A protein has these predicted regions:
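Hydrophobic face of amphipathic alpha-helices that form TPR/SEL1-like repeat modules
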Residues: 1, 14-23, 53-60, 89-93
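Short helix-capping/linker turns of helical repeat alpha-solenoids
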Residues: 2, 7-11, 23-25, 45-48, ...
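TPR/TPR-like alpha-solenoid repeats
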Residues: 5, 20, 57, 78, ...
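Fold-core signature of tandem repeat domains
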Residues: 6, 17-20, 28, 43, ...
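Acidic, Ser/Thr/Pro/Gly-enriched interdomain connector segments
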Residues: 67-68, 75-119
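Short acidic, glycine/serine/threonine-rich helix-capping segments at coil-helix boundaries
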Residues: 99-100, 110-140
């Protein structure tokens, strides 16, 4: 069912199938590269969780040829999608990303005029506020 939906271009199914291949599942042989390829395909379709997954995989160094700047662009796009889970994950567990990716995210937020603080990789109150504003929340 996932494969059929993924073949029809449904980003949710592509992302879910990517997870199943990346992790391995009952009846499905583990194939991390196929999982990454599917995550990238879903991210290209602007699927927020796929963009977040790709950023995490880049941060872990498993996506060839991608840098912390690439991870930050995926995180920023995921934030801008307006999906609360992405904001919650970034807000509650920012240290799951390495300092270089966190700095690159701050730089991406600054480039898009959401952040004017120090680019230091510390996800403090200023960066948190900037992420909420980029997400679409107003106020503090």
């Amino acid at each position: 069912l996932y494969r059929k939906s993924a073949d029809l271009g449904f980003a949710d199914a592509i992302n879910d199938l990517g997870f199943l291949y990346y992790q391995g599942a009952s009846g499905l042989k583990r194939d991390p590269q196929k999982g990454i390829d599917l995550f990238l395909k879903a991210a290209d379709l602007r699927h927020p969780q796929a963009m977040y997954n790709v950023a995490a995989l880049i941060d872990d160094g498993v996506v060839a040829g991608k840098t912390p700047d690439d991870a930050a662009r995926y995180l920023y796009a995921a934030l801008r999608s307006g999906v609360r889970d992405v904001l919650a994950q970034l807000s509650e567990r920012p240290n799951q990303f390495k300092p270089a990716t966190r700095k690159a995210l701050q730089a991406e937020l600054a480039k898009n005029r959401f952040y004017s603080g120090k680019i230091d990789g510390s996800i403090g109150q200023g960066t948190q506020r900037s992420m909420r504003i980029a997400f679409g929340e107003t106020g503090n």
